[in-house]
Amino acid sequence: MKKTICFILATILCFCFASCGQKAEPAQVSLSTVMQEIRSSVSLPEMMDLTAENLQDYFGIEAGEITDFAACINANGYQKEEIVLLRASDAASAESLVQKLNLSLENAAAEMQNYLPEQYALVKQSAVRTDGLTVSLCISENAQQIEAILDKYFK
């Protein structure tokens, strides 16, 4: 009887120690890998990749705010199509990125409202998305397909 009780207690103790172990962090996929899947899976117009310098010019995003990024915009000037994937360096930077992308979205809506009403509608239905430290903006006619790919990686 004593051996059985000792065995049960030892087993419970082992489970307690095992559950206290450090949990493995999920592997962070490169945002360029996510962008490659988006571009290969979704029908997009001719897109131009953005550099870190372009991020500063287009969105006011400083290099120190992000640890990884992938971004592209429509190569022509009359059709609004943007996919921006950013990984913030910390929570404060993530909040700053959300604000900057929201400002960009508001500016795009104001710009398109009088010139291209159909593009205005596309911009108005777009939103900035956050998944932990990953912040994204998707302005696209195929936004649902792109969001499904993002869900696969970040949900």
Question: Model-found features: residue ranges?
Answer:
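Positively charged n-region of N-terminal signal peptides that target proteins for export
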Residues: 1-4
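Short Gly/Thr-rich strand-loop-strand
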Residues: 91-130
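A short, solvent-exposed beta-edge/loop patch
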Residues: 75, 118-155
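Sec-dependent N-terminal signal peptides
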Residues: 7-13
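A short acidic-to-branched-hydrophobic micro-motif
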Residues: 80-90
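Bacterial signal peptide processing site
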Residues: 21-23
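Short, compositionally biased low-complexity segments enriched in polar/charged residues
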Residues: 48-79, 92, 96
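C-terminal motif of bacterial Sec signal peptides marking the signal peptidase cleavage site
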Residues: 15-19
